[in-house]
């Protein structure tokens, strides 16, 4: 019985070339893993008109939902609920302002069709997912504020992290600066943010410990402030766009929230129109 010849053995020169190629590929992969993330471009300044438009849009949306004003925790006598089919295009516009809608549009198109057909399932229109962050994102986008300066998102925590990161990297030009909720008196255009979790953070600096993980939050847009009160408009508040009148002291500083209410953790100072070459100082 004769032995069958095996496959030809690679030459030493070929083996060396293969080893060198493998080593080069490994170094390339390691280099790619170690490459630093690109530094984002600095944010651009905006004219005062951007903040003014932001406030006009927030106020107009609030009026379209019935112009309801409540104190924290209070329920209004009447409100135009999100489940009213007449409000379908309003909330749809908010969701169209975020890059990922979490399936909200597809789900609620089906519920809208059910409501039009008299199907009881239509009563759940716009109940899920929560749309408060989409509302804030819509106001910013409609005011002409680009995603670089305000990256709208379906989750408040995502854009909160982006604003905190911008303030750390570009403190001189960041359009929004995080402040402690009781360190400053809020002004129109600022964002007032609260933690809705069971173990809430009490200061925006504590957010770093989450390392980007989702945290239930809610942010409102301050539209009026003065001695004794801070008025802020938010979406998905009592199933509508609602204006909440938060108590403040004689100097306009927020008073601590009542027990059981979401915990304030930040006021994001709005610097649109307040950075060079613009120097507007009025509200």
Predicted regions and their residues:
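C-terminal motif of bacterial Sec signal peptides marking the signal peptidase cleavage site
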Residues: 30-32
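...with weaker cross-activation on analogous glycine-rich loops/strands in unrelated enzymes
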Residues: 152-238
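Low-complexity, Gly/Ser/Thr/Pro-rich intrinsically disordered linker/tail segments
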Residues: 231, 236-283
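Short loop/turn segments at secondary-structure transitions that flank enzyme active sites
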Residues: 64, 139-142, 146, 198-200, ...
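Bacterial N-terminal signal peptides that target proteins for export
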Residues: 2-22
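Short, solvent-exposed loop/turn and secondary-structure capping segments
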Residues: 70-73, 150-152, 204-205, 243-245
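Residue-level signal for mature regions of secreted extracellular proteins and peptides
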Residues: 26-27
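N-terminal capping segments
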Residues: 37-150
């Amino acid at each position: 019985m004769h032995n069958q010849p095996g496959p030809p053995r690679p030459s030493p020169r070929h083996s060396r070339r293969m080893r060198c190629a493998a080593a080069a590929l490994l170094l390339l992969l390691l280099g790619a893993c170690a490459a630093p993330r690109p530094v984002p471009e600095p944010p651009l300044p905006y004219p005062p008109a951007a903040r003014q438009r932001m406030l006009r849009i927030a106020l107009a949306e609030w009026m379209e939902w019935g112009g309801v004003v409540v104190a924290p925790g209070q329920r209004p006598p009447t409100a135009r609920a999100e489940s009213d089919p007449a409000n379908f295009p309003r909330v749809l516009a908010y969701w169209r302002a975020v890059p990922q809608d979490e399936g909200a549009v597809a789900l609620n198109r089906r519920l809208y069709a059910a409501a039009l057909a008299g199907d009881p399932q239509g009563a759940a229109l716009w109940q899920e997912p929560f749309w408060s962050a989409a509302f804030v994102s819509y106001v910013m986008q409609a005011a002409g504020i680009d995603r670089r300066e305000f990256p709208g998102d379906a989750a408040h925590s995502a854009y909160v992290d982006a604003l905190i990161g911008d303030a750390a990297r570009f403190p001189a030009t960041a359009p929004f600066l995080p402040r402690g909720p009781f360190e400053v008196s809020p002004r129109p255009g600022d964002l007032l943010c609260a933690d809705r979790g069971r173990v809430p953070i009490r200061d925006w600096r504590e957010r770093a410990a989450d390392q980007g993980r989702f945290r239930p939050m809610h942010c409102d847009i301050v539209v009026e402030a003065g001695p004794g009160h801070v008025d802020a408009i938010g979406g998905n508040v009592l199933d509508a766009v609602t204006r909440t009148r938060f108590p403040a002291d004689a100097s306009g500083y927020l008073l601590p929230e009542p027990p059981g209410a979401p915990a304030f953790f930040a006021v994001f100072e709005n610097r649109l129109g307040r950075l060079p070459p613009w120097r507007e100082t009025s509200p």
